[in-house]
Amino acid sequence: QRSQAPFRRTRKAGTSAMAVQCVCFHPTRPWLFVATQRYVRIYDLVQQALVKTLQPGVRWISSLDVHPSGDHVILGSYDRRVQWFDLDLAERPYKTLRYHTRAVRAVAFHPHLPLFASAADDGTVHVYHATVYSDLLQNALLVPLKILRGHAVQQALGVLSLAWHPTLPWLVSAGADGDARLWTP
C-alpha cells in the first residue's frame, strides 16, 4: 500500500496559516479539497496535481462542504461568514452570507434536497434553500429559510457540528452545551 502526499508543500515549518483545517472529497471526481487557514486547495489525486485554489478572503476557514453535484462549495469561517463558490465561475466566492453574529463552526449540504445549513457560536443554525440550475448561464439561487435556536452558548461556544439525514429533511446539531438536537420540518 502506498500513501499519496499531493499537499506536501501546503505546510511550511512554524506557520499556522498553512496548517490544514478541514478536508473533503469531491462526490464524483478523484479530487480532494484541503482547507488551510486562508485558502482551499483542490487536488487531483490521480494526477497528483493542484487543480485550483479558492480564495475566500477570510481570516480563518473553519468548515467546508461540497455540493452533491460537485460544482459548488460552501465554507464557513471564524469571522462569521458563509461563502458559496461556483467552481465553474471563479476562484472567488459567488456569494457571501453574513447572517451569523459569531464564528461559524460547521456547514453542510443535504445529500439530495436543495438545502444547506450553517452552525455558529451564536447558538443558532441557519437553514438555506439552494437551487442549482443545470443551465450554466443561470446562477445558483440562495434563500435563507429558517433560524433554529435551542442550543445554549457555553464558554463562548455554540453549535459545533451538523449532520443531515440521507434522504429526509432532518437535521441534527451538536452543541457545546452537551445537547444533540433533531430538527424536523
Residue ranges and their predicted role:
Residues V23-R29, D65-G70, A108-L113, A163-L168:
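Loop/turn segments within WD40 beta-propeller blades
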Residues L160-P185:
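Blade-level signature of beta-propeller repeat domains, shared across WD40, Kelch, NHL, RCC1
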Residues A35-Q37, G76-D79, A119-D122, A174-D177:
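Conserved strand-to-loop turn within each blade of WD40 beta-propeller repeats
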Residues Q1, V40-D44, V82-D86, V107, ...:
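WD40-repeat beta-propellers
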Residues Q4, Q47-A49, L89-E91, V132-S134, ...:
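Short coil turn/linker residues within repeat-based beta-strand modules
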Residues P6, A13-V20, Q55-I61, L97-V104, ...:
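WD40/WD-repeat beta-propeller blade N-cap
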Residues F7-T10, V51-K52, R92-K95, L136-Q138, ...:
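A structural motif specific to WD40 beta-propellers
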